[in-house]
């Protein structure tokens, strides 16, 4: 039987999905399973690692049954995962010693405060490209070792293993034969030197993490090990591709050249720009991260996040009841020529890159007696585009690379008004692909390259299909006037504390 399909596993924050992708890069079938969110205390978020694993087994079975494709036809498995979420488990039994601590969880704030107090910020920044924040995996591992009796001692003896979700899934799928991660996930731990490409002794000492518990770091596209037959319907199938979700989306968008960038419009926005084989150190509070490692070399990316994007549209729907469903926002915004000087600064939880102001709160400016809900809705949508320009401008400043085109995905990328305004306010075209499942595609492409379904990146590029290209329609003078108004609004919001 010909092995012509790739199985892509997308292990996310609220659910796990499995998709089968054919040689043309088309999604043949999908299965999805949600799992419980655990909130032990305010600000803490945990998952059961065993429940995540059970959900993965369920979606693998589900997608094969749904598509009537045999496990014998699967050429390889690609994995993409919620980044930073951390698991520590017993090497012998395979049982986690504590829940997985999720990327959103703030329970390691005290560890972060101590690192800042001890003056580690510059060391961490210069070696990892990251900031000291509970977001990243290293402090989560430290917390588990501190809070589970005897864990530190057992870790030092080599009895415990650490991993992000990709590592946990590969370990389980291969029956414990492979304890590995890829470059993109390793670069989110605070423990990995992204320049020397190795676990860093100084960083390990700083958090007192025993080297014995760390996975081997491997390329993002490579056959790591085969599944054990009892986990894959009697078949040994190569696990052959891994990337963290945002890097996988960059790959799935075909952003292979230096200077190509993508924006994922989800609850927040994640912007990544490929900076090629050179790591760019940001002067604007952006993260420097490994994009992927393929063909014996690594490529880097700059990353910026916007805290509030799609959630601002949800706020219009659920909080203000201005729209019945999120998609209605496009119709309202398109009815008027402009937002008539109204600006919404959706700083509901502070502002992310490049402002990094956690104290600022949401604000609305420029209201008059003539302001109607159309202007309010339009200004809210426009705020997503302004924030995107803020981050991309910071990326251009840091990298010295001018953006030629922005590729987009995620829920709000379906909003034609927003995408046109995004192009206008950036002054570059915006491209939306036919297949919005770019994260899953990225994992599939990485695995398919390793097992020979696709020959090289050039072949993959052909499978990126354009849905719509939004060309710039706004004159530069108008663009700069609008953007100047946005900056005034942000400054005014920051002054109101």
UniProtKB/Swiss-Prot annotation:
Presence of the UniProt keyword Cytoplasm in the record: no
Residues binding ADP, per UniProt: 13, 17, 267, 310, 411, 415
Signal peptide: none
Sequence positions that bind glycerol: 83-84, 135, 245-246
Sites bearing Phosphohistidine, chain numbering: 231
EC class of the enzyme, as a word: transferase
CDD domains hit by this protein: FGGY_EcGK_like (cd07786)
Gene Ontology molecular function, alphabetical: ATP binding; glycerol kinase activity
Protein name as annotated: Glycerol kinase
Organism: Listeria welshimeri serovar 6b (strain ATCC 35897 / DSM 20650 / CCUG 15529 / CIP 8149 / NCTC 11857 / SLCC 5334 / V8)
Lineage: Bacteria, Bacillati, Bacillota, Bacilli, Bacillales
Primary gene name: glpK
